[in-house]
């Protein structure tokens, strides 16, 4: 058994953990990142980064590197499930950047993870460290890992995802299945001759299902969401799917949707989970970040972006109020973040049902509401973390 002393231990080497490490470094706060996987890999094909997320990455000096491997969508388009009509459209591209002060990017998760890891460097990243125990000591927190090693830290940040082990030290809240599931895929553009506006972010909305897609370079990333199964019986996050299962759910939809689904092998089915609101995000010297604190449904494309916000605000609060006795910093962090992330969670949950309406008066009313989308949800995209550490203390 080995033991090392670190100032701040970040549990989880995903987008949130690495971003936090980089943000702490900018403030001169030493941290070490502990990741359970033996090597860094990202689950999921791609991620949409809105202005509230790209603003954080720009401040970390990663803007040019990430822009080179990202795709900027031309529009946000909502379409009818069967005839493909453009029901509502909003500009993105330069208009979005000028409106919100930072760009919108579609990017491979692997490219984002790689850029963060390279910026962080290998010296502060410890792989193969599966957290098994959290023990409070008089001089800090002792973390025990599955390989038998231990680490004593002055402060611990749980950035270890929706099934967070660190969260058990704060509360016993567990994720809740939404009653919906998703299928992911990456399709070459040239395999989709029927697809209109391939450079746009597009939602195809229909009875009991929807399909979202956007371009990542020469491929189209899609997420198809269906209702059911009623109960999630698989212990892992995915369930096996039979060949053609997804296509059967979208029978009768527009040819572009069918082309997209049939262009790739049948993927596993992902259960879509959310995390009920936590009464607190911290206890003692332990605090949560990202999905560990507020896992949400993907229908606003805000999971990664809210995690980036968390990382920036937490680093700012620790720098402003001190990491030696973190209670004050944690309190400011929670006040800055809990209400906002809860609002995004609620809105994402409601959006799930709205995207699945059958044709009729309710769908018509939804389409009219979508025309005001930019005004209704500007509060998400225009967020600037730099005002938060000070604002919550005012």
Task: Label each region the model flagged.
Residues 2-8, 52-188, 230-247, 380, ...:
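Conserved N-terminal helical subregion
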Residues 9-38, 157-158, 183, 213, ...:
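Conserved mid-domain beta->alpha element of the FAD-binding
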Residues 199-232, 247-250, 272:
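Active-site substrate-recognition segment that forms the wall
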């Amino acid at each position: 058994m080995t033991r090392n002393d670190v100032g701040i231990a970040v549990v989880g080497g995903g987008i949130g953990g690495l971003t936090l490490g980089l943000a702490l470094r900018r403030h001169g706060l030493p941290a070490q990142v502990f990741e359970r996987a033996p090597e860094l890999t990202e689950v999921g094909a791609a991620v949409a980064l809105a202005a509230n997320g790209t603003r954080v990455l720009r401040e970390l000096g990663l803007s040019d590197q990430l822009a080179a491997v990202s795709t900027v969508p031309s529009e946000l388009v909502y379409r009818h499930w069967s005839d493909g009509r453009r029901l509502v459209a909003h500009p993105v591209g330069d208009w979005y950047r000028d409106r919100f002060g930072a760009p919108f990017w579609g990017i491979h998760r692997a490219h984002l993870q790689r850029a963060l890891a390279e910026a962080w460097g290998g010296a502060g990243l410890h792989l193969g460290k599966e957290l098994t125990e959290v023990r409070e000591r008089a001089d800090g927190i002792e973390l025990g890992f599955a390989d038998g090693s231990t680490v004593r830290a002055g402060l611990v940040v749980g950035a270890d995802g929706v099934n967070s082990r660190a969260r058990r030290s704060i509360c016993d809240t567990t994720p809740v299945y939404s009653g919906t599931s998703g299928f992911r895929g990456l399709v070459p553009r040239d395999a989709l001759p029927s697809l209109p506006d391939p450079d746009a972010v597009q939602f195809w909305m229909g009875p009991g299902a929807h399909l979202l897609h956007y371009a990542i370079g020469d491929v189209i990333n899609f997420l198809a969401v269906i209702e059911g199964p009623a109960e999630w019986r698989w212990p892992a996050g995915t369930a096996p799917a039979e060949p053609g299962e997804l296509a059967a759910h979208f029978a009768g939809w527009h040819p572009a949707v069918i082309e997209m689904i049939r262009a790739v092998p049948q993927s596993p089915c992902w259960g879509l989970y959310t995390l009920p609101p936590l009464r607190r995000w911290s206890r003692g010297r332990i605090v949560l970040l990202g999905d560990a604190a507020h896992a949400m449904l993907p229908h606003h494309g805000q999971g990664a972006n809210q995690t980036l916000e968390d990382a920036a605000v937490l680093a700012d609060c620790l720098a402003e109020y001190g990491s030696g006795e973190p209670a004050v910093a944690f309190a400011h962090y929670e006040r800055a973040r809990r209400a906002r992330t809860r609002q995004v969670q609620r809105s994402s949950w409601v959006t799930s049902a709205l995207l699945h309406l059958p044709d009729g008066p309710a769908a018509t009313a939804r389409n009219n509401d979508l025309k005001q989308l930019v005004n209704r949800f500007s509060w998400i995209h225009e967020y600037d973390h730099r005002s938060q550490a000070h604002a919550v203390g005012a």
